[in-house]
Amino acid sequence: MKILVVNCGSSSLKYQLIDMTSEEALAKGLVERIGIEGSILTQKVNGEKYIIEEPMKDHKKAIELVLQALVDKEHGVISDMSEIAAVGHRVVHGGEKYASSVLINDEVMKALEDCVKLAPLHNPPNIIGINACRELMPKTPMVAVFDTAFHQTLPDYAYMYPLPYELYEQNGIRKYGFHGTSHRYVSSVASEMMEKDLKDIKVITCHLGNGASLCAVKEGKSVETSMGFTPLAGLAMGTRCGDIDPAILLFMERELKMSPDEVDTVINKKSGVLGISGVSSDFRDIEGAAEEGNKRAKLALDVYHYTVRQTIGAYTAVLNGVDAIVFTAGLGENSAASREEILNGLEYLGIKIDAEKNKQRGKQIEISTEDSKVKVFVIPTDEELMIARDTKEITAK
C-alpha cells in the first residue's frame, strides 16, 4: 500500500510517497514559489534529484506536476497513479471539533473553512491543497491529520484562559497547542525505546525548531503544551516572542503608536532569538556569534535555554514526576550544546547525561547514563510517517 503525504504552505508544498509495507519513503519532494516567478519542483529518489522548473500558477498545477514526477518513466517510483491508495494531508488547525484524524468529505471541508479564523495563515493553503488533490484524484480517499488534535485531551483547567467565559463560548478562545503529530510520534518511539507501554510512563517531549513547543504526555495523552491559542505562545523561538506580559502589546500600540499589523510583525517575525541577538533566527549562526564573544547572541541563547528548562520544570510538576525527556526537531536533534544547557540545572531530577552520546547529531539515541533516574532521548521526528499511518488506519475502516 502506497500513501502520498502532502503538506501545503502558502507558496510551497512538501510531499512524500510512503510504502506502508516497509514504512519507507519511496520519494520525497518540495515545490517552491507556487504562484510566483521561478516555480521549481525538486524530487529525491535514492539520493538522486529530479528537478522540474516551469510556471505553477496555483497549488493545483503544483500537484499535477507532483503526480507527473511520481509516475515519470525515468525518475518516478510508480507506473500509474492508481498505485496511490490514499492521500494524507497535514492540517494545522482542527479546532475543538477534531480530536483525531478524519476521512475527508464535504462536511469536513466545511469544518476546515470554519477553522480559518483560528489559523488564518495556515489553514487556507491546507484547504487549497486538499481541494486540488480532490479535483485531480476524485476516487482516491483523503485523510486530514491535525496539528492540534493530539492536544484535545488537555483538561479544561489546562486549556481555559482566565478571560471572560463568553470569549471561549462565542469565539473559541482557548489553548489549542500545535506540533501535535510530532509530539505524538516521538512519545510513542520513546516508549518503544524504554520497552514500556506509553500508558505507563510520563514523558516530556521538546520539539525545538524555529518554532518550538513542549508537551507533557501522561498515559499516552497530551495533558499540557506550551503553544496556546496560536503558535506564538510559550517558549522564546526563532522569530516569535513566546509568552510575554500582554500589556506590552497595548503599550506598543498606545505609547509607541504602532498599528496592530506592525505589532503582529514584531512579535511573530522580529522577536525571539533574532530579536535579542540581532544576528539571525538560525541557531547555528547565533551559536557561532556567541562563541566569537557576541554578548547579545549569548544572551539570546541563555533566554531560549532558560524558557525551555523552566517549562520542563513546570511540566514535571504537572505530571507529578517524569520518566523520560525527548528532544526532537532541528535544534533538538542537532545541537548537543543546547541540550546540555537546557538540562544543566535539572540535576535535582536525577538526570545524568553521557557527554559522548550527547555529541551524536540527528540520530535516534538515548543520551542519558545507565544510572540516570530520568531517561533522555534524541528522536528525529517523522510527522509524515505518522500522517501516513493515520491515513492507512482510517482508510482501512
Curated annotation (Swiss-Prot):
Its cofactor is Mg(2+); Mn(2+). GO terms for cellular component: cytoplasm. Substrate binds at residue 90. Keywords: ATP-binding, Cytoplasm, Kinase, Magnesium, Metal-binding, Nucleotide-binding, Transferase. It comes from the Bacteria. Its EC number is 2.7.2.1. It is found in: Cytoplasm. Its main location: cytoplasm. ATP binds at residues 14, 207-211, 282-284, 330-334. The active site is at 147 (proton donor/acceptor). The record marks 179, 240 as: Transition state stabilizer. Homodimer. Belongs to the acetokinase family. This is Acetate kinase. It comes from Clostridium botulinum (strain Langeland / NCTC 10281 / Type F). The lineage of its organism: Bacteria, Bacillati, Bacillota, Clostridia, Eubacteriales. The gene is ackA.
